Amino acid sequence: MKSLAPGIKLITSFSRDSWYRFSILFLTFVFYTSYHLSRKPISIVKSQLHRNCSNVVHPANLNITDNDTWCDWVPFDGKNYQNLFGVLDNCFLVAYAVGMFFSGIFGERLPLRYYLSTGMLLSGLFTALFGLGFYWQIHSLWYYCLVQALNGLVQTTGWPAVVACVGNWFGKGKRGFIMGVWNSHTSVGNILGSLIAGVYVSSAWGLSFIVPGIIIASTGVICFLFLVERPEDVNCTAPQHHERVEEEPLLRNSSTNEEIFNSHTSTAVEPVEDHSEAISFCGALRIPGVVEFSLCLLFAKLVSYTFLYWLPLYIANVAHFDPKKAGDLSTLFDVGGILGGIVAGLVSDYTGGRASTCCAMLIIAAPMLFLYNKIGQNGLPTTVGMLLWCGALVNGPYALITTAVSADLGTHECLRGNSRALSTVTAIIDGTGSIGAAVGPLLAGLISPTGWNNVFYMLIAADVLACLLLSRLVYKEIRGWCGYTTRQRGFKEI
């Protein structure tokens, strides 16, 4: 008898449910990568909108009135250009923070496929409109602010929808690890966005926005054609979100940790009535842990986004690297964030303590930030090592809260009979965090003239506050560990 080809053996070794789960994980990864890809060009194009024109060769037929600003793009040619760039950033971030609270409410009441695909199409439109200002010769600050604000609003469709979709397909077993790996889409999108924008920024900066706009709009079409919202829609087995065991501490993971792609994940679940009515905003706030994790993320995201917007400038000013090298080194913070998110997911899966894992990483992050400010620029190896450590410790809790914790709370045991809470809970948590994302860079801009030390003291204080806000949940988890002596930890052999 002829043996099957190795590739066919591999394909047939996975069940139909497993293939669907893998496809959902891959599609949502691509979708949110495109969201971040379309956000990145503005940080790359800023250096082109305002340059040192005295070093630029001007065309012979051009009448130059100001040798220092002739090549700048009005209205960013004045001495207040940094303030105007700050206005552009905050137009996006504030609109994103406000819109996120409403996004989840709409996401629970509209089909995720339509909601997500429409959001990506509109994001592509507004991203491209910013770039079209180059070809239409638009020099009005209000135009660019309006486009940024509208883009910030429609970008809120992404995160609650993709987390809700992944939460619908994956149970609690190994959710932290899977989502920790999956959450790398943030860094992948940032890197791709930088590379694509960099190709066109010097020749025609409008294309730095138009091309990413076309990419995210194209992924919106793919979403409309291929996204499956729930396992039940294609007759797949629904995942296990709850356990039939004695009461456990808040956010405890399944001690059995079922295989994440196993098609038989719901056999131990009691059938429960599933009402189709979506949860209200106030109802989502009453879910145990939502308020604490939301406020924790506010301060955690404040630290993360301050690094995102100010780290290259800090490295250039303090370590005296040129702008390109400073930008390249700053990407190590994102690399550390990927590793931190994966480690946080693994540890929280193994211990069952989401809050304890976040708190431990935040506690260690505070002294590491202090050390980075003091010794982080003493040579290239030290800089690389400290950036990786700080990125892991700062972004690890941020990644865990926005992914696994949001999915856990959106399928919390108190919601039996009302499963439509994932999108609203995710929006509340990420929306609160986005307030910190808007405030952090703004505070850094106000504090940095007084010295970089004060900026780091602000970041350390935010880290400590984030940790303190989880103290009640950590106490409950520790009590649970001490009270349930027969409880097993670790991953069950499959």
From Swiss-Prot:
Q: Which GO terms describe its biological process?
A: glucose-6-phosphate transport; phagosome maturation; phosphate ion transmembrane transport
Its localization reads: Endoplasmic reticulum membrane
- Keywords of this protein's UniProt record, alphabetized? Antiport, Endoplasmic reticulum, Glycoprotein, Membrane, Sugar transport, Transmembrane, Transmembrane helix, Transport
Cystine pairings recorded for this chain = none
Pfam families named among the record's database cross-references:
MFS_1
Q: Which InterPro entries match?
A: MFS (IPR011701), MFS_dom (IPR020846), MFS_trans_sf (IPR036259), SLC37A1_2 (IPR044740), Sugar_P_transporter (IPR000849)
Query: Where does this chain mainly localize?
Result: endoplasmic reticulum
Task: Provide the family line.
Answer: Belongs to the major facilitator superfamily. Organophosphate:Pi antiporter (OPA) (TC 2.A.1.4) family.
The record's listing under PANTHER family reads: GLUCOSE-6-PHOSPHATE EXCHANGER SLC37A2, MAJOR FACILITATOR SUPERFAMILY TRANSPORTER 16, ISOFORM B
Q: What is this protein called?
A: Glucose-6-phosphate exchanger SLC37A2
* Species, as recorded: Danio rerio (Zebrafish)
* Gene name for this UniProt entry: slc37a2
